[in-house]
Amino acid sequence: MNKNYNSYLGLSLEQEFKLKLYSQIVETLNEKQKXRLLLEILKYMLLNDNILKYLIKYTNLK
């Protein structure tokens, strides 16, 4: 990823480092492994969305 994109997302230095490590790991995977990983990541993103929606809906903010 280019530096401007990371800055736009507001990634911390630690997150940028982790992203670099993960990208190196992904490069070693074959296509089938990459697809499984992608689906697993999408699943966790959807679960995260559900958690955020639940918290927004049921958190009593005053």
Curated annotation (Swiss-Prot):
- Keyword Ribonucleoprotein applies: no
What are the subcellular locations of this protein? Plastid, Chloroplast
What's the chief localization of this chain? plastid
Offer one Pfam family short name for this entry.
NblA
Q: Domain of life, per the record?
A: Eukaryota
**UniProt entry keywords in alphabetical sequence:** Chloroplast, Plastid
One GO cellular-component annotation of the UniProt record comes to: chloroplast
Key word Signal present = no
Family that this chain belongs to: Belongs to the ycf18/nblA family.
Q: What else is known?
A: Although originally identified as Cyanidium caldarium, these sequences derive from Galdieria sulphuraria.
The protein, known as: Uncharacterized protein ycf18
Tell me the classification of the organism that encodes this protein: Eukaryota, Rhodophyta, Bangiophyceae, Galdieriales, Galdieriaceae
